[in-house]
Amino acid sequence: MMSAMETNMVLILTIFYNAYFLLAISSQLLLLYLMLKCQNRSLHEMRIYLFNILGLQFISTFSAFVLQCRLKRVTLKHFCRIVPSSGTVAMLCYGPCKYLGNIVCEVLFHILQTSLIACATALIIAFYYRYEMLTNNSFTRSGHYKQLVISYCVPLVFLICEVLSPNDVNKLVAELTVLHPTYGLENYAILGFSDVKTVAASSQTLMLMIGLYGTPFIALVFRKKIIKILHSSRSYHAEKIVQTKSMIQGLTLQTLLPLICYCPGFTYYIYSQYTQSSSLFVEFAVSPYGFVYTIFDPLLTIYYVLPYRRTFKAIFSKHNSTTSATFVHSETARRVA
């Protein structure tokens, strides 16, 4: 049975995840609308990479939400807290997925993790595309697809390592019962890794660390190269320089966001494994941060991709003009009457 503190934390986190889901989907749908509405020629090929990133964010958001249709209320169906134990790590999933069994929750967890890793590689190939366009000024359609295929190789290897990692649920439950007797385990779907010291599990952790800290570093290297090219060349139109600089600034921030969001949870995971300590409050506090960036990522794209920002402003200005015209017309009609 849950303690009073655990019950309150579950309630708070449920409210948080509902708000997160609505905000994330709203920002993603807004970006999708602008991408479909804005037909700027300069973004014709770049849209391939932006659609790829947005699609992965849809997957990472909906993968925790897709089974909700079997319930009557709106709730995010898959959220986890990481619980440390001796040589293992367990995810306690509280949501409708628990009614469908551990296999469903495990599949959803793999989809979440893999799609988030894929988002990082998608940002890197977007940087590479901009760099190639400035240096060679050409990129074939087959080149785009080749880039996309290569970008999914890393997430695929990560997924294989994750699937091959030992996940003896009975061992996890037995260990959790002994080490954390106050946890209401009957209220969760429990999954995780029963031995984090195997080659597969260690490789997965190493790939997480490289992805977490390496992606921003690679992005900053490409950013420096691109800015240097823009400053040294006089053949580019001023508008193209401004637009490229703004887009690169946005992509840079997008690669830094996951680092900021993942750091609390990943740092706690590493700390707990080495110290063999845990905190119920910290487990709940750090669990949501890994997904929060999917709220802000589309907004950064809207702001820093200038054609999308201008399209958004044009729609907003048109709406205000229509509202003002309607008000003036009705006010004039009232006075005449």
Swiss-Prot record:
Transmembrane segment boundaries: 10-30, 48-68, 107-127, 147-167, 202-222, 250-270, 280-300
Keyword terms, alphabetized: Membrane, Transmembrane, Transmembrane helix
GO CC entries: membrane
Taxonomy, superkingdom: Eukaryota
InterPro entries reported for this sequence: 7TM_GPCR_serpentine_rcpt_Srd, Nematode_rcpt-like_delta
Pfam families given in the database record: 7TM_GPCR_Srd
Coiled-coil regions listed: none
Subcellular location: Membrane
Membrane topology designation: Multi-pass membrane protein
Family: Belongs to the nematode receptor-like protein srd family.
Protein name: Serpentine receptor class delta-50
Organism of derivation: Caenorhabditis elegans
Gene: srd-50
